[in-house]
Amino acid sequence: MTKKAKNVEKVPFEDAMKRLEEIIDLMNQPTTALEASLALYEEADQLMRICESRIQEVEARIKQLSDQRSES
């Protein structure tokens, strides 16, 4: 895994979402070069995977708490 990829994994969820919005804006600009768009796409892909993983973790935790409450 590259250093950039490791740094992306440490990004808080809210910061990752904000960066995804920035990437979308950059990719929608007609002045963004093709190679730059590809790099942005790759970064966005990493950020989306991390966000999805964190959402799944939170959903699992919520389910666990809900199950514990209903057992009480």
Swiss-Prot record:
<protein>
    <recommendedName>
        <fullName>Exodeoxyribonuclease 7 small subunit</fullName>
        <ecNumber>3.1.11.6</ecNumber>
    </recommendedName>
</protein>
<keyword id="KW-0540">Nuclease</keyword>
<dbReference type="InterPro" id="IPR037004">
    <property type="entry name" value="Exonuc_VII_ssu_sf"/>
</dbReference>
<comment type="similarity">
    <text>Belongs to the XseB family.</text>
</comment>
<keyword id="KW-0269">Exonuclease</keyword>
<comment type="function">
    <text>Bidirectionally degrades single-stranded DNA into large acid-insoluble oligonucleotides, which are then degraded further into small acid-soluble oligonucleotides.</text>
</comment>
<keyword id="KW-0963">Cytoplasm</keyword>
<dbReference type="GO" id="GO:0009318">
    <property type="term" value="C:exodeoxyribonuclease VII complex"/>
</dbReference>
<comment type="subunit">
    <text>Heterooligomer composed of large and small subunits.</text>
</comment>
<dbReference type="InterPro" id="IPR003761">
    <property type="entry name" value="Exonuc_VII_S"/>
</dbReference>
<keyword id="KW-0378">Hydrolase</keyword>
<dbReference type="GO" id="GO:0005829">
    <property type="term" value="C:cytosol"/>
</dbReference>
<dbReference type="GO" id="GO:0008855">
    <property type="term" value="F:exodeoxyribonuclease VII activity"/>
</dbReference>
<dbReference type="GO" id="GO:0006308">
    <property type="term" value="P:DNA catabolic process"/>
</dbReference>
<dbReference type="Pfam" id="PF02609">
    <property type="entry name" value="Exonuc_VII_S"/>
</dbReference>
